[in-house]
Every structure is written in structure tokens, then in C-alpha cells.
Amino acid sequence: MIDHSSARDAVTRLTRWADDFPQPGVRFADLTPVFSDADGFRVVVDALAACAPEADVIAAVDARGFLLGGGVARELGSGVVAVRKSGKLPPPVLSQSYTLEYGTATLEIPAGSIGLDGRSVLVVDDVLATGGTLDATARLVESAGARVIGVAVVLEIAALGGRERLGKYPLTSLVTV
């Protein structure tokens, strides 16, 4: 088992909590202070990278996952693919839609030009809530021929059930609330 205590301490110390944001009854975890603290960011990136040192590619989820994914890819010497929200990439794209609480959303990656076929991918994002975005990301990169070897997040909100939704994939969360 990998010791994530330094990262866990940094996340616990630096995360800013905002009540009733973006709507009443929601408690939002703002990880921006973690990213802006050089030592905090470094230990978080190191801990996420340790989850799958054999990863060929990091799939970084739009938008805060981009910050983490680039750092993890740099640490591992692997590539990084930005998994974008719909409409941000020119065609052709591969897409995966998923259900939100009130509607649907779609994620996209370039079709054919990023060479994911047969490659080992670690999916990285900041927060695991319901698991919809991360599940869609994993299915999207699998549709490109990649093998998802794990999902790694900084913070997991356990009460929202995302871990169960991602049960097929090895999951690492640095902090669970």
C-alpha cells in the first residue's frame, strides 16, 4: 500500500469549503488552494502518479483534471490526453454522453489522432462525486481502444456513491469525506 499521508495532509489543510455553492444544500470543495501551494501541489501529483506508474497515458478530465493530469504525466514521463466537454474540439471526435441530475452531458476526445489503441490509461480528476463524469471518461477512452488501469482523484465524497459506480476500475482517492 502506498503512503499518501503527505498528500492527504495537504488536501485536508488547504481545501476551502463553500457552503450552499453552486446551489443551496451543496457543500463545494474548492481545491484551488491545493493547486496554488507549490508543496501541496507537488505531493498531490506525486501521490496520484504513484497510483499507476505503468500508465502510458493520463486521461485528464475537463477542467481541473487538466491541472492534475499534466503534472502526473510529467512525473511519470507519460502522455496526457485532455478529455473535453462537448463542443471544444474540432471534428472528428469520439464522444460519450452521460446523465446528470437534471439532463445529460457529453465528453469528447480527438478520434484517431491520439493513438490510444492498446495503451494503458490512468484517469485523473479532482473530485469523485456521483461518478458519472469519471465513468463516462473511462468508457470514452476504452472506446478508443485503451485499457483503463485505474482512476485517481484527490477528493471523494463518499455519500454520493461514485465509488460503487466505478466498481469495475481500481480507484484511488487521496481523501474521502
UniProtKB/Swiss-Prot annotation:
Taxonomic superkingdom: Bacteria
E.C. numbers: 2.4.2.7
Pathways per UniProt: Purine metabolism; AMP biosynthesis via salvage pathway; AMP from adenine: step 1/1
Subcellular location: Cytoplasm
GO biological processes: adenine salvage; AMP salvage; purine ribonucleoside salvage
Entry keywords, A to Z: Cytoplasm, Glycosyltransferase, Purine salvage, Transferase
Recorded catalytic activity of this chain's protein: AMP + diphosphate = 5-phospho-alpha-D-ribose 1-diphosphate + adenine
Enzyme's top EC category: transferase
Molecular functions per Gene Ontology: adenine binding; adenine phosphoribosyltransferase activity; AMP binding
General function of this protein: Catalyzes a salvage reaction resulting in the formation of AMP, that is energically less costly than de novo synthesis.
Protein name: Adenine phosphoribosyltransferase
Taxonomic source organism: Rhodococcus jostii (strain RHA1)
